[in-house]
Curated annotation (Swiss-Prot):
Name of the encoding gene: atpF2
Transmembrane segments: 18-38
Function: F(1)F(0) ATP synthase produces ATP from ADP in the presence of a proton or sodium gradient. F-type ATPases consist of two structural domains, F(1) containing the extramembraneous catalytic core and F(0) containing the membrane proton channel, linked together by a central stalk and a peripheral stalk. During catalysis, ATP synthesis in the catalytic domain of F(1) is coupled via a rotary mechanism of the central stalk subunits to proton translocation. Component of the F(0) channel, it forms part of the peripheral stalk, linking F(1) to F(0). The b'-subunit is a diverged and duplicated form of b found in plants and photosynthetic bacteria.
Membrane topology: Single-pass membrane protein
NCBIfam families registered for this protein in UniProt: PRK07353.1 (NF005607)
Oligomer and partners: F-type ATPases have 2 components, F(1) - the catalytic core - and F(0) - the membrane proton channel. F(1) has five subunits: alpha(3), beta(3), gamma(1), delta(1), epsilon(1). F(0) has four main subunits: a(1), b(1), b'(1) and c(10-14). The alpha and beta chains form an alternating ring which encloses part of the gamma chain. F(1) is attached to F(0) by a central stalk formed by the gamma and epsilon chains, while a peripheral stalk is formed by the delta, b and b' chains.
Ion transport recorded as keyword: yes
Subcellular localization, as worded in the UniProt entry: Cellular thylakoid membrane
Sorted UniProt keywords: ATP synthesis, CF(0), Hydrogen ion transport, Ion transport, Membrane, Thylakoid, Transmembrane, Transmembrane helix, Transport
A cellular-component GO term for this protein: plasma membrane-derived thylakoid membrane
InterPro entries reported for this sequence: ATP_synth_b (IPR034679), ATP_synth_B-like_membr_sf (IPR028987), ATP_synth_b/b'su_bac/chlpt (IPR002146), ATP_synthase_B_chain (IPR050059)
Full protein name: ATP synthase subunit b'
Primary subcellular site in the record, as a coarse category: membrane
């Protein structure tokens, strides 16, 4: 019974002209689908794959450039900070040097003024002593003259 269903008229393996016609339709449909659907879709998929690959490569390149620029900028910032610190240190040294020079000049001026005042005081003292000696001699002579005149 099963053999009749499989090989009989209208069965599963009926070898009349329908089978080759169906095979021809399948081949024809495959060529049509390949020409109208699979090739364009394959092309679009390949184009997108190329686009994605290119975009990823460009993104990696840009990322590498950005990292390189970041490193360069960090180095520039580091060197700028070092230069600024050096400038600050030099300015502090210059300021300290100017302070010391100004202090030395002020001390020298103060010492010179003190020495000048001491010399003036000494000169005035010597002058006063000389005048007092002269006055004392005159007064002594006057006293001696009066004592001699009173005798």
């Amino acid at each position: 019974m099963t053999s009749l269903l499989l090989f009989g008229a209208g069965g599963l393996f009926d070898f009349d002209a329908t089978l080759p016609l169906m095979a021809l339709q399948v081949v024809l449909l495959t060529f049509i689908l390949n020409a109208l659907f699979f090739r364009p879709v394959g092309r679009v998929v390949e184009e997108r794959e190329v686009y994605v690959t290119t975009s990823r490569a460009e993104a990696k390149q840009k990322l590498a450039e950005a990292e390189k620029l970041e490193l360069e900028l960090k180095e520039q910032l580091k060197s700028a900070r070092i230069a600024a610190q050096q400038l600050i240190q030099e300015a502090e040294k210059d300021s300290e040097q100017l302070y010391r020079e100004a202090l030395a000049i002020a001390n020298a001026d103060a010492n010179a003024a003190r020495e000048k005042a001491r010399r003036e005081i000494d000169a005035q003292r010597d002058s006063a002593l000389t005048q007092l000696k002269g006055d004392a001699e005159k007064l002594g002579d006057l006293i001696v003259n009066r004592l001699l005149a009173a005798k």
